[in-house]
């Protein structure tokens, strides 16, 4: 079994003043660390426990946390932003309206969490928006990354990897505020999940777990504005020298696989793994394949780091 610290709070400096980041660690702290960065509106518990355990079993020290404006981390209550106005400005090349924070600020939060834990470096894994944050972290703080894993994410080029209309509607529509209604509505997210492995009972169970821990749809508009305001990373990705693995599913309709393919095309020497029957999620039957690929990538990066290859 993994050594689990239980939830803890890190008080870190940020662009808006000190904030609290809720985090959890699993495994031996002396092992190479992997920092797991979640996506839009997703909490640390959205990383499946079994997924984390598999990485621990492969010899890694796993850290998962709540981004600001999500879960049990600091929330910017009452800070109003119009993500549609930000998107329109970004799309037309106009001046971006003020936003509370950008992906760079979220990446800095992750770096400050590493500082809090006394870790100089870690493997950086990000899923969806978390992949955007992970890419930004490695671009802006390359010395902190032992490797990069970009999981069903995109480059910030708006024309590549855009969601289908059905997926966008499911993502951006206001969720029910009543607990039972929220749980009952959760299968709608199946539109972008792995169809072959879709389990409605499990989806509703996880929705209940997430709702009971923290229901905070208000944070989504600010996270979305951060994505839009940050723009394309294409130019910077071409300069990366960090060992990079890009993973995407063939059935992803939220961020379709051309976004992952483009990421891998841009990052020099990167590896692209396209997983059949995988959507915008981590279904249990695919966890051995996915964690195995991640572990092999990180172990190769560790060997290259140790030998200078």
What are these regions (language model features)?
Residues 139, 148-177:
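Flexible "cap/lid" loop of the alpha/beta hydrolase fold
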Residues 19-93:
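Conserved HGGG/HGGXW glycine-rich cap/lid loop of the alpha/beta-hydrolase fold
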Residues 253-259:
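Conserved alpha/beta-hydrolase "acid-adjacent" motif
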Residues 240, 246-248:
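Short beta-strand/loop motif that positions the catalytic acidic residue
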Residues 163-235, 239, 262:
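Alpha/beta-hydrolase
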Residues 270-309:
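Catalytic active-site module of serine/aspartate enzymes centered on a nucleophile-bearing elbow/loop
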Residues 131-142, 148:
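Short glycine-enriched nucleophile-adjacent loop
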Residues 92-100, 104-122:
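Conserved acidic catalytic loop of the alpha/beta-hydrolase fold
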């Amino acid at each position: 079994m993994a050594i689990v610290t239980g939830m803890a709070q890190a008080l870190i400096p940020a662009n808006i003043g000190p904030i609290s980041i809720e985090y959890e660690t699993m495994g031996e702290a002396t092992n190479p660390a992997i920092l797991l960065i979640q996506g839009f509106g997703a909490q640390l518990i959205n990383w499946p426990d079994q997924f984390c355990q598999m990485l621990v079993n492969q010899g890694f020290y796993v850290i998962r946390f709540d981004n600001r404006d999500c879960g049990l981390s600091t929330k910017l209550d009452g800070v109003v932003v119009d993500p549609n106005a930000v998107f329109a400005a970004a799309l037309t090349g106009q001046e971006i309206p003020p936003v509370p924070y950008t992906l760079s600020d979220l990446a800095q939060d992750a770096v400050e969490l590493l500082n809090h834990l006394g870790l100089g470096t870690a493997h950086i894994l990000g899923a969806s928006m978390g992949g955007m944050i992970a890419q930004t972290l490695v671009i802006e703080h390359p010395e902190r990354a032992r490797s990069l894993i970009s999981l069903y994410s995109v480059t910030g080029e708006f024309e590549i990897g855009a969601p289908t209309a059905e997926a966008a509607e499911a993502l951006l529509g206001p969720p029910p505020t009543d607990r039972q209604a929220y749980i009952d509505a959760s299968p709608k997210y199946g539109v972008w999940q792995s169809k072959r492995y879709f389990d409605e009972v499990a989806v509703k169970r996880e929705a209940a777990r997430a709702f009971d821990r923290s229901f905070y749809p208000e944070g989504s508009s600010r996270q979305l504005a951060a994505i839009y305001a940050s723009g394309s990373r294409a130019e910077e990705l071409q300069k990366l020298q960090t060992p990079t693995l890009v993973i995407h599913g063939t059935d992803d309709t939220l961020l379709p696989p051309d976004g992952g393919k483009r990421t891998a095309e841009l990052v020099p020497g990167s590896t692209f793994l396209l997983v059949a029957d995988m959507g915008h999620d981590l279904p249990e039957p695919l966890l051995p394949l996915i964690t195995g690929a991640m572990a092999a990538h990180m172990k190769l990066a560790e060997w290259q780091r140790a030998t200078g290859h």
